[in-house]
């Protein structure tokens, strides 16, 4: 059965009609490093259970909008359908090796891993017939992918008021299979084959959302929650959620980052093959940090690691509007030797946990995630008195 039993389920329509403060959750892409994110989410869930007094309390009971890219899309879809963090973690622990099953030698010219094992597991978890607009989704859900056919980012949500979610539209996005959208968001080029999805009578080729600007989907989620054009089907006075530091909380969870520092690099080493391998990751790293920066510029940062040595963590920063639009917390780990040492994980080899397919490092990734949660996640970040469920 997909989703929670009806008596425990939050009805999305009722949630959208509420005037309570809004809580938004975003999870980065990063392959198997999603396990790190889940340890942070487990601590958040524990604090919410503690405050609510309900052992069966889930992240879907608290968060109104959940966004994810790539592996973050798997986690976000799990949260939106009412899964506990333990249930989502079990998916990774039980299926991690299957998700990264090698292609035959000849097929590795197209992609390193098979798509079928992951697709099959996604069908089992989310249901083959469950669509983006299914009632099993208790929150708004944003999944990020790239439409390779049209050369455009595709941030797609189940917002019933979005332009292409009109049930009268012949290619209504709400009718698309949830498992297939999640699979498309995880179709990392060179790692996995692309996913072909038919929208109405048109087939489109999709790849991982990590190759867009939104591998960290936090600020894009904020825009889709507040900009009126993303709510075009709603009555004018209901197009977008109200902003304010006591009216909106955005929580962003990373999968670990590491700058590709190389102080021994010489100009002669920067040949065609070097640039072909280094530029994509450099662009993704810059885009991920830009999303984080935008959230701190327009939001009141209550938690987050240093962005750089010039602007620091931007806690207490004024910003260009002279007022902040939301409260913001960013939890992430720096997967460098220094960063791991600061988390009490100095014995972990950085190279072993930096790769998105480091199946053998799952235990270390869990340990790192627990260390991040212990150091940085605080009960006051989720104060029920301010951001009531």
Q: Can you say where each PLM-predicted feature lies in the sequence?
A:
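Non-catalytic, mobile gating and regulatory segments of ester bond hydrolases
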Residues: 1-15, 21, 238-240, 260
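C-terminal helical/tail subdomains of lipid-metabolizing enzymes
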Residues: 2, 19, 211-214, 238-245, ...
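Patatin-like phospholipase
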Residues: 9, 18-26, 32-125, 168
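Extended hydrophobic secondary-structure segments that form protein cores and membrane-embedded regions
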Residues: 24-27, 60-70, 140-146, 205-207, ...
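Active-site gating loop/helix substructures
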Residues: 32, 100-101, 136-230
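Short mixed-charge
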Residues: 48-61, 227-248, 302, 308-315
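Active-site periphery "cap/insert" segments of enzyme catalytic domains
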Residues: 116-140, 152-155
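Extended C-terminal subregions enriched in glycine
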Residues: 233, 249-270, 294
């Amino acid at each position: 059965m997909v989703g929670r039993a009806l008596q425990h389920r939050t009805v999305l329509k009722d949630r959208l009609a509420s005037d309570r403060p809004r809580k938004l959750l975003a999870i980065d892409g990063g392959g198997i490093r999603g396990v790190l994110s889940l340890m942070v989410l487990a601590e958040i869930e524990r604090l919410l259970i503690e405050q609510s007094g309900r052992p069966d309390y889930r992240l879907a009971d608290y968060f109104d909008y959940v966004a994810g890219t790539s592996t973050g899309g798997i986690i976000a879809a799990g949260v939106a359908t009412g899964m506990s963090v333990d249930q989502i973690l079990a998916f990774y622990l039980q299926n991690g090796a299957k998700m990264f099953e090698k292609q035959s030698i000849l097929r590795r010219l197209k992609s390193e891993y098979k798509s079928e094992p992951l697709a099959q597991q996604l069908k089992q978890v989310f249901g083959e017939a469950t669509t983006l607009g299914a009632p099993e989704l208790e929150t708004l859900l944003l999944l990020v992918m790239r439409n390779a056919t049209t050369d455009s980012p595709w941030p797609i949500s189940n917002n019933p008021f979005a332009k292409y979610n009109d049930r009268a539209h012949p290619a209504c996005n709400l009718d698309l299979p949830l498992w297939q959208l999640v699979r498309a968001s995880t179709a990392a080029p060179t790692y996995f084959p692309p996913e072909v999805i038919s929208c109405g009578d048109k087939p489109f080729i999709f790849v991982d959302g990590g190759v867009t600007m939104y591998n960290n989907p936090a600020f894009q989620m904020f825009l889709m929650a507040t900009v009126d054009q993303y709510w075009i089907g709603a009555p004018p006075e209901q197009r977008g959620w109200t902003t304010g530091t006591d009216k909106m909380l955005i929580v962003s969870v990373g999968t670990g980052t590491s700058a590709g520092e190389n102080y021994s690099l010489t100009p002669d080493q920067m040949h065609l093959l070097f640039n072909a391998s280094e530029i994509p990751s450099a662009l993704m790293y810059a885009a991920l940090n830009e999303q984080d920066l935008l959230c701190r510029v327009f939001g009141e940062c209550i938690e987050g690691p240093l962005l750089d040595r010039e602007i620091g963590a931007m806690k207490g920063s004024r910003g260009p509007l002279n007022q902040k639009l939301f409260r913001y917390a960013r939890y992430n780990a720096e997967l460098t030797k220094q960063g791991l040492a600061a988390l009490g994980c100095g014995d972990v080899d950085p190279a072993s946990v930096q790769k998105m397919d480091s199946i053998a490092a799952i235990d270390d990734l869990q340990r790192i995630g627990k260390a991040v949660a212990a150091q940085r996640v605080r009960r006051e970040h989720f104060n029920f008195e301010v951001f009531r469920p």
